[in-house]
Amino acid sequence: MNVYYEQDADLGFLQGKNIAVLGYGSQGHAHALNLKDSGMNVCVGLRSDSTSCQKARDAGLEVKTIADAVTWADIVMVLLPDQNQKAIYEAEIAPNLVPGNTLAFAHGFNIHYKQIIPQETINVIMIAPKSPGHLVRRTFTQGNGVPCLIAVHQDYTGEAKQQALAWAKGLGGTKAGVIETTIKNETETDLFGEQAVLCGGSAELIKAGFETLVEAGYPEELAYFECMHELKLIVDLYYEGGLSRMNYSVSDTAEYGGMTRGPRLITPAVKAEMKKILEEVQDGRFAREFIDECQNGYPNLNRLREENRTHSIEKVGARLREMMSWLIKK
C-alpha cells in the first residue's frame, strides 16, 4: 500500500485552476476553507435557497449556483448527500463539464455503483479524509492534518493522481499521511464498517445489553450508564491505542470478563452474518435497496427512526444527560 507525505505532493497541480466545492456541510466547509487558506481559487456551489449560502459568504467564500460553479470550475468536488448526487449530476453537473475537467468525490458510492457514469474525457478522483469535517478544519488551523485516502477512477489528462495528492495536501492530509486505494475498496469497506460495526452492530449491541438488564429488574438508569454512557470511555481508549491500550487501562476484572465472555456474544454465527452483509455490499444488493428506499420516500427508514426515537434507552438517556454539565446541549 502506497502512503504519501508532504514531499510527495505538489500544490502546483491546483494553483491557477478554478475549484468548486459543491455543498457546505461538515466536509464541504472544511474542504473549501482549507483549500482557500492553502492559496487556491475556490468557490462554493449551492442551491440559491440554501441556508448555507450566507454561512459560506460570512467565511469569505464566493458562492455560486451549482450549475454556475461547475461551468466556472476546472475541478469540481461533489460533497452532496449520496442520495442526491445522481439527480444533481444529471441536471446541473454533467451538462456543464468540458473535456479536461476533474470531477472529485470524498466517497465512492455513486461512482462504484454506477449511479454516476462520468464522460470519458474528464478525470475522476477521490479524496476522503478519515475524520469528520470539523476535525479536518481544526487540525489544519493548528498546522497539522488528518489521514486521507485517495483514488483515481479516470485519468484523462495524465495528472489525476497528482491533483488528488495536491488536494489532500491542501487539506493538510499529507502532514498525517495519504493512503492510495481504489473507489471499490473505499466504498465497500466504508459501507461494511458502518453497517456491521459503527452504526449498526454497536447500536444493536447497546440496545440488547440495556434491554437485558432492564428485563432482569435493574433500574433503567444503571442500565444506561453501563451499556451506553460508559462506552465512550472504552472507545476513546481504542481510538488512542487500540485493543491493547483498552485492556491495559481497564481493571483486571473487566479485562478478564471481557476476554472470556466477549467471544460468547460474537460467535462464528455472528461473523457468518457479517460475511452476508459484506456480500450484499459487494454485489450491489444494499445499494439497490437503499436507492429504492430513497425513491419511495424512505418508508422503512422513517419507521426505524421512529422505533429508535421511542426506545426507552432514548428517554432515560435524555433525562440523565441533563445531569451532565460538560455536554453541549443541542
From Swiss-Prot:
It is an enzyme of class 1 (oxidoreductase). SUPFAM superfamilies: 6-phosphogluconate dehydrogenase C-terminal domain-like, NAD(P)-binding Rossmann-fold domains. Substrate binds at S251. One of its GO terms (molecular function) is ketol-acid reductoisomerase activity. One of its GO terms (biological process) is isoleucine biosynthetic process. Mg(2+) 2 binds at D190, E226, E230. Its cofactor is Mg(2+). The keyword Oxidoreductase applies. Residues 182-327 form the KARI C-terminal knotted domain. The active site is at H107. One of its GO terms (cellular component) is cytosol. Pathway: Amino-acid biosynthesis; L-isoleucine biosynthesis; L-isoleucine from 2-oxobutanoate: step 2/4; Amino-acid biosynthesis; L-valine biosynthesis; L-valine from pyruvate: step 2/4. It holds the Pfam family KARI_C. Its EC number is 1.1.1.86. Binds 2 magnesium ions per subunit. Residues 1-181 form the KARI N-terminal Rossmann domain. Keywords: Amino-acid biosynthesis, Branched-chain amino acid biosynthesis, Magnesium, Metal-binding, NADP, Oxidoreductase. The keyword NADP applies. Mg(2+) 1 binds at D190, E194. It comes from the Bacteria. Involved in the biosynthesis of branched-chain amino acids (BCAA). Catalyzes an alkyl-migration followed by a ketol-acid reduction of (S)-2-acetolactate (S2AL) to yield (R)-2,3-dihydroxy-isovalerate. In the isomerase reaction, S2AL is rearranged via a Mg-dependent methyl migration to produce 3-hydroxy-3-methyl-2-ketobutyrate (HMKB). In the reductase reaction, this 2-ketoacid undergoes a metal-dependent reduction by NADPH to yield (R)-2,3-dihydroxy-isovalerate. HAMAP family: IlvC. Belongs to the ketol-acid reductoisomerase family. This is Ketol-acid reductoisomerase (NADP(+)). The gene is ilvC.
